[in-house]
Swiss-Prot record:
Transmembrane segments: none annotated. GO terms for molecular function: RNA binding. Belongs to the snRNP core protein family. Residues 5-77 form the Sm domain. Gene3D superfamilies: 2.30.30.100. InterPro entries: LSm4/Sm_D1/D3, LSM_dom_sf, Sm, Sm_dom_euk/arc, SmD3. Residues 108-151 are annotated as: Disordered. This is Small nuclear ribonucleoprotein Sm D3. The gene is SmD3. Residues 112-151 have a biased composition (Gly residues). It comes from Drosophila melanogaster. Plays a role in pre-mRNA splicing as a core component of the spliceosomal U1, U2, U4 and U5 small nuclear ribonucleoproteins (snRNPs), the building blocks of the spliceosome.
Length: 151
């Protein structure tokens, strides 16, 4: 499974100044050294603002991804290549259409939505493509089926 666009953008922010707020309310602002796929962030030259308003300077900090409430990334990342419309082979015209288009494409691949008949031999006369008179190989049709023989 590939990583999503937000995580790709987070990786693009490595080496830039970001702001990170944790679920405890502390705000860390500094240079992002490394970001992992689970959003763990390693930062340097940090200015931390605590919930009560006090500030402190830290040299290095490592923040667990599940403890991050949100991140503020540089505006220059709006032009990152991940936000460009993807075109080309393999996309089949479903780029940016969401989960519904994916499910539709998968259903088409399984033979749904087409003309009736075909499939497991449940329709059509014997000898027709996909047809065996209603009896498939697994039901004792003309092609066998658990030792019962044909018709």
């Amino acid at each position: 499974m590939s990583i999503g666009v937000p995580i790709k953008v987070l990786h693009e922010a490595e080496g830039h100044i970001i702001t990170c707020e944790t679920i405890t309310g502390e705000v860390y602002r500094g240079k992002l050294i490394e970001a992992e796929d689970n959003m763990n962030c390693q930062m340097t030259q940090i200015t931390v603002t605590y919930r009560d308003g006090r500030t402190a300077n830290l040299e290095n900090v490592y923040i667990r991804g599940s403890k991050i409430r949100f991140l503020i990334l540089p505006d220059m990342l709006k032009n990152a290549p991940m936000f460009k419309k993807q075109t080309g082979k393999g996309l089949g015209g479903t780029a940016g259409r969401g989960k519904a288009a994916i499910l539709r494409a998968q259903a088409r691949g399984r033979g749904r939505g087409g003309p009736p008949g075909g499939g497991r031999g449940t329709g059509g006369p014997p000898g027709a493509p996909g047809g065996s008179g209603g009896r498939g190989a697994w039901q004792g049709g003309p092609t066998g089926g658990r030792g019962r023989g044909g018709l």
